[in-house]
Amino acid sequence: MEESPLSRAPSRGGVNFLNVARTYIPNTKVECHYTLPPGTMPSASDWIGIFKVEAACVRDYHTFVWSSVPESTADGSPIHTSVQFQASYLPKPGAQLYQFRYVNRQGRVCGQSPPFQFREPRPMDELVTLEEADGSSDILLVVPKATVLQNQLDESQQERNDLMQLKLQLEGQVTELRSRVQELERALATARQEHTELMEQYKGISRSHGEITEERDILSRQQGDHVARILELEDDIQTISEKVLTKEVELDRLRDTVKALTREQEKLLGQLKEVQADKEQSEAELQVAQQENHRLNLDLKEAKSWQKEQSAQAQRLKDKVAQMKDTLGQAQQRVAELEPLKEQLRGAQELATSSQQKATLLGEELASAAAARDRTIAELHRSRLEVAEVNGRLAELGLHLKEEKCQWSKERAGLLQSVEAEKDKILKLSAEILRLEKAVQEERTQNHVFKTELAREKDSSLVQLSESKRELTELRSALRVLQKEKEQLQEEKQELLEYMRKLEARLEKVADEKWNEDATTEDEEATAGLSCPAALTDSEDESPEDMRLPPYGLCEHGDPGSSPAGPREASPLVVISQPAPISPHLSGPAEDSSSDSEAEDEKSVLMAAVQSGGEEANLLLPELGNAFYDMASGFTVGPLSETSTGGPATPTWKECPICKERFPAESDKDALEDHMDGHFFFSTQDPFTFE
C-alpha cells in the first residue's frame, strides 16, 4: 500500500457509510454497511479500514478487511454491501475516536464515516425509559434494557413462528401449485403433442396441396402448350391444304399443257407427213424433233426424281412448258417456212420431167430420198412410241399425285384426330384438376371436422373422467355402506348363534324333564293297569297324555296299516319320544363347518322340537306362537294322525306361517323347509367381493 495524505471530508459522490453508531462494544464483531455510488467498479483489491480520526496516511490503520464484490451489478444504480470486523482485531475501549474509511486499489480514500468510540456499556445504558402511548400521563417508566429486549425477542419469536406457519402454508400452496403446474405442464405437453400431430397432418395436407397445385400448374402449362401446338397444327393443316390446292391447280394446268402438247404433236405429225417431199429439211426437222423428244425424256426423268420438291418441280414444269411452247412456236414457223419449199419441190419435179438427164440423177436422188423416207418413217414411229411412253409417264405422275393427295388427306385426318384426342385429354386433365381441387377442399373440411370432433371428444372425455371420478366416489361410499351392513349382519349372525345356543340348552333341559315325566307316567300307568283297569277307563278322557299327538318313535317305521298301541295295551316295542340331541351338531365341528351345515343343524333342532310336542316348541320359539307349531306339526306328523284316525287327512296345499305362501301337497318337503329357512337363516358368505 502506498502512503497518501488523507482528506478529512469525503469527496463529493464518494462511498457513503450507513447506520454508523456512536459507540461500539469491544470484544463484539462490528458490521459495517456502505453504499458505492453509481459508476463505481468494485474490486477485490479495495479494502475498508478502521482509522483513528487524526490518522494522516493509509498505513495508519488499526485493522482492515477486504471489500466484498457483489456477483451482479446493475448499470446506473448504487451498490449496497457490508463487511464484518472480527472482535479480536478491534481496538481496546477508550476515549479515542475512530472512523471507517474506504480505500481503493490505487490507495486513494474514496469515503469515510462519522467518528465513533469503543467503550464498555455504562449501568445507565442498561435502563430504558418508556413512555405511555397515549401521552396522557407524565410518569416515566424505567425498566431494564434486557426486559425490553426480551419482550422484543419474544415478539420477534412469535412473529417468526407466525411467519414460519405462514411459510409452511405458503410452501403447501406452492406444492399444490407445483403439482397443478405439473398437471398443467402435462396437459400442455399433451396439447402440444396433439398440436404437433395436427401440424404434421396440416403440413402433410399442405405438401399434398402444394404438389397438387404444382401438378395443376404443370397441367395448365401443358394445356397451354397443347393449345399452342393445336393452333400451330391447324395453321400447318391450313397451309398444307392451300399447298395441296395449289398443287392440284398446277396439276390441272400440266394436264391441259400435256393435252395441248399432244394436239400440237399430232399437228406436227400431220405436217411431217406433208413434208415428205423435202427429205433434207424433214430429216433436219426430225433430228430437231428427236432432240426435243430426248430433252422431254430428260425432263420427265427429272420430274420423276423431283416429286418430293413439288413447288420447285411445278416451277420447273412451268418453265419446261414455256420452253415447249417456244419450241412449238419455232416448229410452226418452220412448217410455215416449208410451204415455199414445197412449191420449189414441185417446180423441181416439173424440171425433172422436162429434163431426162436430170431424171437419172433425180431417180438416184429419189432412191436415196426413199431410203431417207423410210428412215424418217421409222424414226417417226419411234418418236410416236416415245410420245406414248411420255404419256404413260404423265399418267403415272397423275396417279402419283392422286396418291400423294390421298396421303395428305389421310395425314390431315390423322392430325385432326390427334387434335381431337389432345382436346379430349386437355378436357380430362381439366376435369381431373377440378376433382383434385374438390378433394383438397373436402380434405380441408374433413380436417376442420376432425379438429372439431377432437375438441368435442376431449371435452366429452373430461366429462366422462369427472363422471367416472364421481361414480368411483359413489362406489367407494357404497362399498363403505356395504361393509357396515356386512358388519351389522355379522353381529346379527353372532346374536342368532348365541340365541340358538340358549335354545339348545333350554331344549336339552326340556327334553330331560319330558323324558323323566314320561318314564314316571309309564311306570304309574303300568302299576295302575294291574290294580284297577276300570278306573283308568273312567279317567281316560281327562288324561293329558291322550290329548297329545302320538309320540314320534320307532314304531313310525313299522307297518303303516297297524294302529299304534294305546295306553291300555301292552306294546312289545318301547316308544322313546326324546328328540335327537343337538349338542353334537353345535359342538366342536360346528365352528369349522360352513354356514349351510349350521343352518341344517338349526333346522333339525326346530323340527325335532316341533315333532316332540307343542310345549317344547312354545318354549323354544315363544315369538311365533301356535301358528308355527300347528303348521309344522300338520305337515310333519300328518301320516301319524292318518293312521290313528283311519281316514285321509292330507291337506291339498302347504302354507308358510310367515309369508302365507302356498306350496302344493305333492311338492317336496325340502322346498317348504328351504323357504322357511330363508326367513330365519342366511348364509355368512359374501354375495360378492369388491376389489
Swiss-Prot record:
Compartmental location: Cytoplasm; Nucleus
Region N-terminal AD (CTNNB1 binding site), annotated ranges: 1-190
Zn finger residue spans: UBZ1-type: 653-679
Residue list for modification Phosphoserine: S4
Binding, Zn(2+): C656, C659, H675, H679
Gene3D superfamilies cross-referenced by the UniProt entry: 2.60.40.2840, 6.20.250.40
Region listing for Disordered, in residue ranges: 513-604
UniProt-annotated stretches for the region Interaction with GATA1: 45-125
Function, as annotated: Functions as a coactivator for aryl hydrocarbon and nuclear receptors (NR). Recruited to promoters through its contact with the N-terminal basic helix-loop-helix-Per-Arnt-Sim (PAS) domain of transcription factors or coactivators, such as NCOA2. During ER-activation acts synergistically in combination with other NCOA2-binding proteins, such as EP300, CREBBP and CARM1. Involved in the transcriptional activation of target genes in the Wnt/CTNNB1 pathway. Functions as a secondary coactivator in LEF1-mediated transcriptional activation via its interaction with CTNNB1.
Name of the molecule in the record: Calcium-binding and coiled-coil domain-containing protein 1
